[in-house]
Amino acid sequence: MAVPKKKTSKSKRNMRRSHLALGKVNVIVDSQTGEYKLPHHVSLVDGTYNNRQVVTKKIETAEEVA
């Protein structure tokens, strides 16, 4: 079984982990609703993508929910 000969210093450990950081999330403002959304994703507020309606909202009544 392989065992390290010397203790890895904090500097070496942190340099090895330097590429593991998460990148920033690119968030844009939706031109129609003004809400924040991820690029190339459907707007969660009104269901539009690229200025086209792609998802219609289903209106649930109290009878359907119960």
UniProtKB/Swiss-Prot annotation:
A Pfam entry, by short name: Ribosomal_L32p
Family annotation (SUPFAM superfamilies): Zn-binding ribosomal proteins
Record's keyword terms, sorted: Ribonucleoprotein, Ribosomal protein
Molecular functions per Gene Ontology: structural constituent of ribosome
The keyword Ribosomal protein is assigned to this record: yes
One GO CC annotation: large ribosomal subunit
GO BP term, pick one: translation
Domain of life: Bacteria
Entry-linked InterPro entries: Ribosomal_bL32, Ribosomal_bL32_bact, Ribosomal_zn-bd
Family: Belongs to the bacterial ribosomal protein bL32 family.
Protein name: Large ribosomal subunit protein bL32
